[in-house]
Curated annotation (Swiss-Prot):
Family to which the UniProt record says this protein belongs: Belongs to the TRAFAC class TrmE-Era-EngA-EngB-Septin-like GTPase superfamily. EngA (Der) GTPase family.
Residues at which GTP 1 binds: 11-18, 58-62, 119-122
Pfam family, one: KH_dom-like
Organism encoding this protein: Borreliella burgdorferi (strain ATCC 35210 / DSM 4680 / CIP 102532 / B31)
Protein name: GTPase Der
UniProt superkingdom: Bacteria
Length: 433
């Protein structure tokens, strides 16, 4: 069973915690892996918002009563605070009582993961009361009415961004994420992949703000492809939909082996494309730059080569990445895209032994004259997919970046040609005798 991030709902009795719990769960949606306790215990549900999941935990009312049951309830709440990822503190916007202040004081040490939820905002007129709660010191807050379902969608969207987890099913040979701006051709490509020409294994459709996950077979290999909703340029950083669109794309990148960065050939490259490229490289994922809608281009001689040169200038960090042109409508370049995916996956899984690496390293060192104060000790590959090496030197301060690039270029020649190569520098402390 997957271990989901946990969201704890706390508050005194009668502030609407259970009503909020049920609204967030949204029983009209599919809820799985339920675990119920008795009334004095915590009530837990795995909540699914679109295709993202997290564990939602309802608690008994936090009270100053001294009876045995109340003390047990309070103790359970307090013991849970350390273990969860997010705390929803529910207050009644109409009144704040002594018990509320006691809870607030207990939560001070966890303030970084506390989100204030002001409930019973049943009418727009009550929204003006929110300013009375600003001095409580919690930066994030939501105005909701669990009874009338006001503000719930915004809260659910926030939760799936903040703590939502999504996992790709096992059993795929290659996992590919399709990333790009709206209208870059992602949906057309995914529809082609899931069409009659391909044997579909399974589909998982999402909404326009979610993603579509498709599993199919190609040349005897099982592909799993995730198509995200388009990444928009953020006009307003605080706008949750824009925050979510980028956050969702980053989560997809984390899940997959290879990213197809889809770019409409008629559009300009943007800073958002560059940010995604940096993140992919940082994570060591395979990446293919794909220019879509090639059938709409009046291609002159040398146009594609000029385009590739422009991309390498705009994306110097991706000078290793293959660049393709496709048209789903005209069936241009699709087979080549699949073949490239196989090649990249093989490179991501390549492992070179430490003895072989160091034999080559000795040859490389002879051809490059390092500053006498820097001496290379040895190199070892510590992981595949992502491919990562550790290079040990006598000191790493002011280590020449030119040698780092020289090393990476040589590693590309031994089989890691078109993937990100992560190299960590470590200082080798002289053995004491």
């Amino acid at each position: 069973m997957l271990s989901y991030k946990k969201v704890l709902i706390v508050g005194r009795p009668n502030v609407g915690k259970s009503a909020l719990f049920n609204r967030i769960l949204d029983t009209k949606r599919s809820i799985t892996e339920s675990t119920y306790g008795v009334t004095r215990d915590l009530v837990e549900e795995v909540c699914k918002v679109d295709s993202f999941k997290f564990k939602l935990i309802d608690t008994g009312g936090f009270t100053i009563l001294k009876d045995e049951i109340s003390k047990i309830v309070v103790q359970k709440v307090l013991s849970s605070l350390e273990k969860v990822d997010l705390i929803l503190l529910v207050l009644d916007i109409n009144e704040i009582l002594l018990e509320d202040y006691q809870i607030i004081e207990r939560l001070r040490k966890y303030s970084s993961k506390v989100v204030l939820v002001l409930n019973k905002v049943d009418t727009k007129d009550k929204e003006c009361l929110a300013h009375e709660f600003h001095n409580l010191g919690f930066k994030r807050y939501f105005l909701v009415s669990a009874a009338h379902c006001r503000g719930i969608t915004k809260l659910r969207d926030f939760l799936k961004v903040e703590v939502g987890e999504v996992g790709i099913e096992s059993g795929a040979d290659i996992k590919v994420g399709i990333i790009g701006k709206p209208n870059s051709g992602k949906s057309t490509l995914i529809n082609y992949l899931s069409g009659n020409e391909i044997a579909i294994v399974s589909d998982q459709p999402g909404t326009t703000r979610d993603f579509i996950k498709t599993k199919f077979t190609r040349n005897g290999k099982v592909f799993e492809v995730v198509d995200t909703a388009g990444i928009r340029r953020r006009a307003r950083v605080n706008e949750i939909v824009e925050y979510y669109s980028v956050n969702r794309a980053l989560k997809v990148i984390d899940m997959v082996d290879i990213v197809f960065l889809l770019i409409d050939v008629q559009e300009k490259l943007t800073s958002q494309d560059k940010k995604i490229a940096h993140y992919v490289t940082k994570k060591g994922k395979g990446i293919v730059i794909v220019f879509s809608k090639w059938d709409l281009v009046d291609e002159s001689k040398g146009y594609f080569e000029a385009l590739k040169s422009h991309v390498k200038f705009f994306f110097p960090i991706l000078n290793f990445a293959p660049i393709f042109r496709i048209s789903v409508h005209k069936r241009i370049g699709l087979d080549s895209l699949f073949k490239e995916s196989f090649k990249l996956k093989d490179q991501l899984e390549l492992k070179t032994s430490t003895p072989d690496l160091n034999k080559m390293l000795n040859l490389w060192i002879k051809d490059y004259h390092l500053n006498i104060s820097h001496k290379i000790k040895y190199i070892t590959q510590v992981s595949t997919n992502p491919v990562k090496f550790i290079l040990f030197a006598n000191k790493i301060k002011n280590f020449p970046n030119s040698y780092y690039n020289y090393l990476v270029n040589n590693l590309r020649k031994i089989g890691y040609k078109n993937i990100p190569i992560l190299v960590e520098l470590k200082e080798k402390i002289r053995d004491l005798k």
